[in-house]
Amino acid sequence: MVVGIEGIITKKEPTFIIVKCASGLSYGIFISLFCSAKIQTQEKHEFFITQIIKEDSNKFYGFLDKDEQKMFEMLLKVNGVGANTAMAVCSSLDVNSFYKALSLGDESVLKKVPGIGPKSAKRIIVELSDTKTKLENVSDDKSEALAALLTLGFKQEKIISVLASAQATGTSELIKEALKKLG
């Protein structure tokens, strides 16, 4: 099972990239539009990978952010939601918007995602309702890091942008990584 890939992006389409690793192997990876907006060709990146093996395919789904990967994997557990629909949600909603819609039971937010109708939106809300508390805890680390960095005098827009691309988990690690990037 592949859980991570690091390498140079040699080809980029809106939701698909090819990454060439130091070993010489190249991998095709499906990504969200949010991920796509943060990367360029000829840049080196590390991706968290969710590998889906089926009888006729072996696909990699890549994420720069561990929270987005968790969201994708949770959506896959919902009856009737496949990888394409889960990736459409990841491309249409950022992690915080998804968590907020889930915690409020707001089906209208999910219905705006291409491929999700009223029944699917309701099913996602119902089946993931027991994970609401887990979701709220994931974003708490970033909220705490944001508050700490604001007290240090950094501008909110810059902090949010840095935290969105942060790879670290846990409040203290997020703050350390953000401080390095904020200078």
Curated annotation (Swiss-Prot):
Positions of region (Flexible linker): 139
Ranges for region Domain III: 139-183
Organism domain of life:
Bacteria
Q: Which InterPro entries match?
A: DNA_helicase_Holl-junc_RuvA_I, Hlx-hairpin-Hlx_DNA-bd_motif, NA-bd_OB-fold, RuvA, RuvA_2-like, RuvA_C, RuvA_C_sf
Q: Give Gene Ontology CC terms.
A: cytoplasm; Holliday junction helicase complex; Holliday junction resolvase complex
Biological process annotations from GO: DNA recombination; DNA repair
- Specify one Pfam family: HHH_5
Localization (cell): Cytoplasm
Q: Which UniProt keywords apply?
A: Cytoplasm, DNA damage, DNA recombination, DNA repair, DNA-binding
Q: Name one GO molecular function term.
A: four-way junction DNA binding
Which Gene3D superfamilies does UniProt cross-reference here? Answer: 5' to 3' exonuclease, C-terminal subdomain (1.10.150.20), DNA helicase RuvA subunit, C-terminal domain (1.10.8.10), Nucleic acid-binding proteins (2.40.50.140)
Q: Where is this region: Domain I?
A: 1-64
Q: Where is this region: Domain II?
A: 65-139
> What HAMAP family does this protein's entry cite?
DNA_HJ_migration_RuvA
Q: Which NCBIfam families match?
A: ruvA
Q: What is known of its domains?
A: Has three domains with a flexible linker between the domains II and III and assumes an 'L' shape. Domain III is highly mobile and contacts RuvB.
Give the UniProt family note: Belongs to the RuvA family.
What interactions and quaternary structure are annotated?
Homotetramer. Forms an RuvA(8)-RuvB(12)-Holliday junction (HJ) complex. HJ DNA is sandwiched between 2 RuvA tetramers; dsDNA enters through RuvA and exits via RuvB. An RuvB hexamer assembles on each DNA strand where it exits the tetramer. Each RuvB hexamer is contacted by two RuvA subunits (via domain III) on 2 adjacent RuvB subunits; this complex drives branch migration. In the full resolvosome a probable DNA-RuvA(4)-RuvB(12)-RuvC(2) complex forms which resolves the HJ.
Role according to the record: The RuvA-RuvB-RuvC complex processes Holliday junction (HJ) DNA during genetic recombination and DNA repair, while the RuvA-RuvB complex plays an important role in the rescue of blocked DNA replication forks via replication fork reversal (RFR). RuvA specifically binds to HJ cruciform DNA, conferring on it an open structure. The RuvB hexamer acts as an ATP-dependent pump, pulling dsDNA into and through the RuvAB complex. HJ branch migration allows RuvC to scan DNA until it finds its consensus sequence, where it cleaves and resolves the cruciform DNA.
Name it: Holliday junction branch migration complex subunit RuvA
Where does this protein come from, organism-wise?
Campylobacter jejuni subsp. jejuni serotype O:23/36 (strain 81-176)
- Gene that this polypeptide is encoded by: ruvA
